[in-house]
């Protein structure tokens, strides 16, 4: 009986234990889900806050930009009617007092007839003039007016060097053209000054690089030209030889390998002898001969050196005309092992006849004995 009573108790305990376990698991899952949802909500809130902050900054930037453009400067408040009426009255009075198209601009017309315009009692001509409250001493007014009157009456003198005429009809006409583009001869030298130079255009007597001006320079040029070369003309239009530029110099100053007879130096010849490889007899150097002796391998008797012989004694395969047969040499050229012309047959000597005779005699003796 006891066993039967314990069995349902054990089953009931196991069931309650399983239910408790399932409840704890469900509670854990619900807690996890709640934490995850809370974290996601927190992240979404932070993102929305960042977006809202960015939107606010964008709106602030747009507002500042609109303020720069003159918009949204604040609430637009209409002007009061009193202010508008005063402004209109001032404008109408000013328009009626001042003409629309004034004929002349005069300092005397600057006085305002009405007291309602806020105008100074007198104009300040200089910054150094002390400011006043409307009370001006009479000497100050007289001084200022006299200065302006003196300036208006003053005129430039036409004889002055800085005066070129204010009349537009005389501009670039008449004598003024000679200042800009002087002709040959042109004006006097006192008027052709450096102040008239423009864009590389100068008078004929103007200073250029290396060119002198005045009578002293002309006299020096003439002296140099006469001493150097009498063929050149002394004209004002042409440059003198002593003034030449661009690598050109007079005859006494020639460079680039050309010099006159009186300026010859080492290796330099006069103009009449400046042909390549040609030198006169007095300028011969080693290995150089005059034109009459400039044949290859030919030298005169007076210029023989070691190993060189005159025409009649040339060797190297060349003989005079009377001896131009191969293997023939004259008596005066015999050397060791060489014989005269009458003995120069290949393999033949002076004792050939004796040998022949001896051979013949020996042959005859043999035949006779036989």
Swiss-Prot record:
Start-end of Low complexity biased regions: 28-40
Residue span of region Disordered: 28-52, 210-230, 344-370
Chain positions found as Leucine amide: 60, 69, 199, 209, 246, 256, 266, 276, 286, 296, 306, 316, 326, 336, 346, 364
Segments of skewed composition (Basic and acidic residues): 210-226, 347-358
Signal peptide extent: 1-18
Gene Ontology CC: one annotated term: extracellular region
Tissue: Expressed in all ganglia of the CNS, but only in a subset of neurons including L10 in the abdominal ganglion and B16 in the buccal ganglion.
GO BP of this protein: neuropeptide signaling pathway
Annotated propeptide span(s): 19-50, 73-190, 213-237, 350-355, 368-370
UniProt keyword Transport, yes or no: no
Cellular compartment(s): Secreted
Keywords, comma-separated and alphabetical: Amidation, Cleavage on pair of basic residues, Neuropeptide, Repeat, Secreted, Signal
Keyword Signal set for record: yes
General function of this protein: Exogenous application of myomodulins potentiates ARC muscle contraction.
Xref: PANTHER family: FMRFAMIDE-RELATED PEPTIDES
Record's protein name: Myomodulin neuropeptides 1
Protein source organism: Aplysia californica
Gene giving rise to this polypeptide: MYOMOD1
